[in-house]
């Protein structure tokens, strides 16, 4: 028996959605590409599968894609072993062949990009209406409606393709998503919001004009334009529209990214409700919903800032030491009366009262710097860079002069006349 025959046997024995059967066949096709079209199930053993894995990963296949192949083929072989379709071995060759993929950030679409995409689609609608010419995506009104349904509801692509005309409950403003069309096999409804009403209203009106029956596929572009020949709309047509939209806007957009974006936006809202988000996306568990949500870094920054305020961490961060060279970002605190620069003497009427004398050090007689003021919890006096430089030069000059004066008596103790001459010259 060949791997392809095994796959068809598995699909025949299970009630699979078309999309699921497509994935099983794609995994089998990838296997035959490596092992050859004439390969049999006996050729596929555990070591051969590991060799295939190494080869395709080295060629650039993503780990997630490999895991998709491995998981689906393991399911097929498990079914074959259980039902004795494979008798040469009871060991599943795909057991423990998955790899750990990197955790990627949630794929969301920025609000600004969504606005640009909506604006471009609206322009296409207006251009078609005014000129009668075919837009780049036609009919533009239909694709704008499709875009808005994904934006407002976050439903899966397959769910949109399976919506029938009868699934729109206009009286209660609800859309029914049938369980047989869903990945989770659960039936649910999504509300029709105010922003979606005009788009769905036109879609239903056009469907009435085209003679749609209640069980007909509602989102079927082929029945709204003579430029399409297919009887039903498929995922390729929707994905082709989103590729054009991505090219125009410059930001990757897909229906599934709109699901991630909706989940993230709902959890950013003040009335965030994880259960509501889970139900709207029709997930089986909370963990899946949480994996859809992108981290809110603005909220994270605010929480971290509140923590630092509560623990007094910013009190030390905000202190600036002006004793060193000034930084471009460091600015002195404003004072009530600006100080005059060196060489500038304020006029008599502008002069202020002399300030209280400041404490001086015993060694040099120079007032203490900012470090001493901070250590004693005394408010720092206003300071400028020019004054700091002047005080530093004066301190160095006085220190050098004092050191020279103390060295002169030692030099003159052995030669009185020469010492007097030296003092005269230093003076």
UniProtKB/Swiss-Prot annotation:
Residues 402-413 have a biased composition (Low complexity). Belongs to the 'phage' integrase family. It comes from Pseudomonas aeruginosa. Site-specific tyrosine recombinase, which acts by catalyzing the cutting and rejoining of the recombining DNA molecules. The active site is at 156, 183, 256, 259, 283, 292 (o-(3'-phospho-dna)-tyrosine intermediate). One of its GO terms (cellular component) is cytoplasm. Residues 116-305 form the Tyr recombinase domain. The keyword Cytoplasm applies. The lineage of its organism: Bacteria, Pseudomonadati, Pseudomonadota, Gammaproteobacteria, Pseudomonadales. This is Putative tyrosine recombinase XerC. One of its GO terms (molecular function) is DNA binding. InterPro entries: CB, DNA_brk_join_enz, Integrase-like_cat_sf, Integrase_catalytic, Integrase_recombinase_N, Tyrosine_recombinase_XerCD. Residues 1-81 form the Core-binding (CB) domain. Residues 323-384, 401-427 are annotated as: Disordered. Keywords: Cell cycle, Cell division, Chromosome partition, Cytoplasm, DNA integration, DNA recombination, DNA-binding, Plasmid. It comes from the Bacteria. SUPFAM superfamilies: DNA breaking-rejoining enzymes. In contrast to other XerC proteins, it has a longer C-terminal part. GO terms for biological process: cell division; chromosome segregation; DNA integration; DNA recombination. Residues 350-362 have a biased composition (Basic and acidic residues). It is found in: Cytoplasm. Pfam families: Phage_integrase (PF00589).
């Amino acid at each position: 028996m060949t791997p392809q025959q095994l796959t068809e046997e598995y699909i025949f024995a299970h009630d699979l959605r078309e999309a699921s059967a497509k994935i099983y066949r794609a995994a089998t096709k990838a296997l035959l590409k490596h092992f050859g079209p004439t390969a049999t199930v006996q050729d596929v053993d555990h070591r051969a599968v590991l060799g295939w894995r190494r080869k395709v990963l080295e060629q650039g296949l993503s780990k997630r894609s490999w895991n998709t192949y491995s998981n689906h083929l393991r399911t097929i072989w498990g079914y074959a072993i259980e039902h004795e379709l494979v008798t040469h071995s009871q060991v599943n060759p795909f057991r423990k062949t998955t790899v750990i993929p990197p955790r990627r950030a949630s794929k969301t679409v920025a609000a600004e990009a969504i606005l640009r995409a909506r604006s471009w689609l609206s322009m296409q609608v207006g251009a078609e209406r005014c000129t009668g010419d075919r837009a780049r995506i036609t009919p533009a009104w239909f694709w704008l409606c499709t875009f808005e349904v994904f934006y407002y509801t976050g439903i899966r692509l397959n769910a949109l393709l399976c919506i029938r005309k009868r699934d729109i409950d206009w009286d209660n403003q609800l859309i029914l998503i049938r369980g047989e069309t869903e990945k989770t096999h659960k039936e649910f409804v999504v509300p029709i919001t105010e922003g979606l009403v005009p788009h769905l209203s036109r879609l239903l009106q056009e469907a009435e004009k085209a003679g749609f029956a209640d069980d007909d596929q509602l989102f079927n572009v082929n029945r709204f334009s003579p430029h399409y020949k297919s009887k039903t709309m498929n995922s390729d047509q929707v994905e082709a529209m989103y590729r054009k939209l991505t090219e125009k806007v410059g930001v990757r957009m897909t229906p599934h990214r709109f699901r991630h974006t909706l989940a993230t936006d709902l959890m950013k809202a003040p009335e965030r409700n994880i259960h509501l988000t889970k139900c709207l996306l029709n997930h089986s568990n909370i963990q899946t919903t949480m994996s859809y949500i992108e981290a809110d870094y603005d909220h994270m920054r605010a929480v971290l800032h509140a923590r630092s305020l509560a623990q007094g961490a910013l009190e030390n961060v905000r202190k600036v030491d002006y004793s060193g060279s000034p930084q471009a970002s460091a600015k002195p605190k404003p004072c009530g009366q600006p100080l005059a620069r060196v060489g500038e003497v304020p006029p008599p009427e502008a002069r202020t009262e002399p300030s209280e004398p400041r404490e001086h050090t015993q060694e040099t007689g120079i007032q203490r710097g900012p470090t001493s003021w901070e250590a004693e919890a005394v408010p720092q006096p206003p300071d400028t860079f020019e004054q700091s430089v002047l005080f530093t030069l004066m301190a160095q000059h006085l220190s050098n002069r004092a050191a020279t004066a103390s060295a002169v008596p030692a030099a003159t103790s052995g030669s009185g006349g020469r010492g007097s001459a030296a003092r005269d010259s230093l003076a």
